[in-house]
Every structure is written in C-alpha cells, then in structure tokens.
From Swiss-Prot:
Coenzyme A-dependent lysophosphatidic acid acyltransferase that catalyzes the transfer of an acyl group on a lysophosphatidic acid. Functions preferentially with 1-oleoyl-lysophosphatidic acid followed by 1-palmitoyl-lysophosphatidic acid, 1-stearoyl-lysophosphatidic acid and 1-arachidonoyl-lysophosphatidic acid as lipid acceptor. Functions preferentially with arachidonoyl-CoA followed by oleoyl-CoA as acyl group donors. Functions in phosphatidic acid biosynthesis. May regulate the cellular storage of triacylglycerol through activation of the phospholipase PNPLA2. The gene is Abhd5. InterPro entries: AB_hydrolase_1, AB_hydrolase_fold. Its EC number is 2.3.1.51. It comes from the Eukaryota. It is found in: Cytoplasm; Lipid droplet. Pfam families: Abhydrolase_1 (PF00561). GO terms for molecular function: 1-acylglycerol-3-phosphate O-acyltransferase activity; carboxylic ester hydrolase activity; lipase activator activity; lysophosphatidic acid acyltransferase activity. Residues 79-184 form the AB hydrolase-1 domain. One of its GO terms (cellular component) is lipid droplet. This is 1-acylglycerol-3-phosphate O-acyltransferase ABHD5. Interacts with ADRP and PLIN. Interacts with PNPLA2. Interacts with PLIN5; promotes interaction with PNPLA2. Acyltransferase activity is inhibited by detergents such as Triton X-100 and 3-[(3-cholamidopropyl)dimethylammonio]-1-propanesulfonate (CHAPS). Acyltransferase activity is inhibited by the presence of magnesium and calcium.
Amino acid sequence: MKAMAAEEEVDSADAGGGSGWLTGWLPTWCPTSTSHLKEAEEKMLKCVPCTYKKEPVRISNGNSIWTLMFSHNMSSKTPLVLLHGFGGGLGLWALNFEDLSTDRPVYAFDLLGFGRSSRPRFDSDAEEVENQFVESIEEWRCALRLDKMILLGHNLGGFLAAAYSLKYPSRVSHLILVEPWGFPERPDLADQERPIPVWIRALGAALTPFNPLAGLRIAGPFGLSLVQRLRPDFKRKYSSMFEDDTVTEYIYHCNVQTPSGETAFKNMTIPYGWAKRPMLQRIGGLHPDIPVSVIFGARSCIDGNSGTSIQSLRPKSYVKTIAILGAGHYVYADQPEEFNQKVKEICHTVD
C-alpha cells in the first residue's frame, strides 16, 4: 500500500508540471497520460528480478524527482547514481539494475522535466537551465541524505553529471561519463570533413522554433508507430527481456508528455544539437582529486574523442577511457554484460 501511495503522489505532482493550451491539447491528440507512462514503466521494470523501492523525492517549488532505489542494506558502500540521457527515463536501465546492485546501493531517477519526474517551466538561458538541473540533483541528494556518490551519466546525463561535479566536487567519489553529450565545441564549417548539406541546414533553420521531439506529438495517434518505425533497434536491444513493444511504448510515453525537459535541452543547444556551453571548455576546472572514467561504444556515431580531450585537460588527474566492443551510443543496452562489468570494476576502485 505504501508503494501505491507513492505512485499516486507522483501522478498528482506530474499533473502540475505544466499548464496552458498545449498541455490540455496533448492528451486529446496524443493517446497518452501520466497513467499510460506509469503503466509503461511498470512493464519495463517487471522483468527486473531484484527488489527495489520507488518513490517521488520532494525538492523545492513543489517539484519531485521520481526515483528507484536498490539498497540491499549495504549502506557502507558508496552508492552508484544513474542519470539517463535525453528522451529517456530510468526504465532504460532495466538491463543493468540487477548486476550493478549486487554489492552496493544503486539509485536511478528521472531527470527533472523527463519521465515521471515533475515537468516545470525552465529558464530560457542555457546557463540558468544547466544550473536548474544541477540544483535539482543536489536537492535530491540532500533529501536522500547521501554523503558521496559515484555519479554515472549517459548522453545529456553525462553532461549534467559533469556540471554537478564541477559545482559540488565534495559529493562525487568518481565521475563516469557514458557517451556524454555536449563536450566538444561545434566545429567551424570549414573544419568539417564533410560539410553539412544545404538542405539539412535549411531544414534545421525551419525547425529551430520547435522542440526536438515535436514531431512525435504532432503525429498524435501515429506517434507510437513512428517510434517503432524509426527506432526498431530499441526492440532488438531489449529482446532478452521483452518480445513485444514494451520498450518503444515506454520511450513513446516518456516523450509525448508536456515537453519540459525537452524544451530545457533545446535552450542549451545550438544547431545542430551542439551545446551552447561546451563542457570541454570547463572540465579542466574539475577538482583534481575526482577520478573520471569515460565509456564509449566502439560502433557509436558520436565523437569518441572526449576522453582523450579530458585527459589532456587534466594531465595530473585520473582519467581513463574505456571502449565497449560491439556497442553503439546506447552502450548499456547494446552490450549490457560488458558494460555492467566495466562499471562494477570502476566502482570497486572507490570501495
């Protein structure tokens, strides 16, 4: 009954996350709701064999962070905290929870503005947006009374994990960046090996006023089939757990709710998906005692040179780059066993 009450609480918190004509229009055109998202998440987590606790962690301004906790009464070990990427949610770690939580507490949460966390209105300034994300992570940590943590972030989560570590270094025992977004600067057109075609630049300019995933919401009742057509790979990645469309349904319902975190992300970017405030310009200021591990997929289309760049910016600090063979951008789902093993090895260097 207690878990059910917690889930009911978060539904009411989500409902207050956005307002206006768009929020009212979305459920009518898009076959989704907070209840649909809750059901989709429960299907994702149904195959996780270990026990866990889930609840909304209250932070400031009436917001809450939807959280999964795998404790196993191992309070002496430094907890591992997982931050998902853009357009994702905590459910996407389903292939990793059991293995990663065998000998230490593991926490995963939906970033503010994503998944089942509150969806507030973010600032339009990139620096302020970043700070809002960072402060939400710090308030979450304080609410759970975690002293220090091993902070792991994928994609946008990697960028935010680095930003948090810069501001609150005393709380981070090890920073693990998994295919992080937002590190390099946007290259000059003259420096690019393959210049961006004119039609792509024109399309990018035309879509500038819109959020990155606006097409899903515009597609309305056809949005789910759109996800299934555009990203059939997600079904394959999780085929060991699910034979149906559980994963694509979860991704769909995560991304057709009020676009709070999505708008925040857009305000942090410049065409074509580059960060306004690249992390490589600042990562050299990270406290020298914080070890950094960078994990990337050997088959990823994302620039895998960030680890080398971080190493050159922190010559006297621990920086290790790890390539996962056979993995693309979604390393943790492409090669979960290898990914889990590497992360556990990193964690064992802490305690």
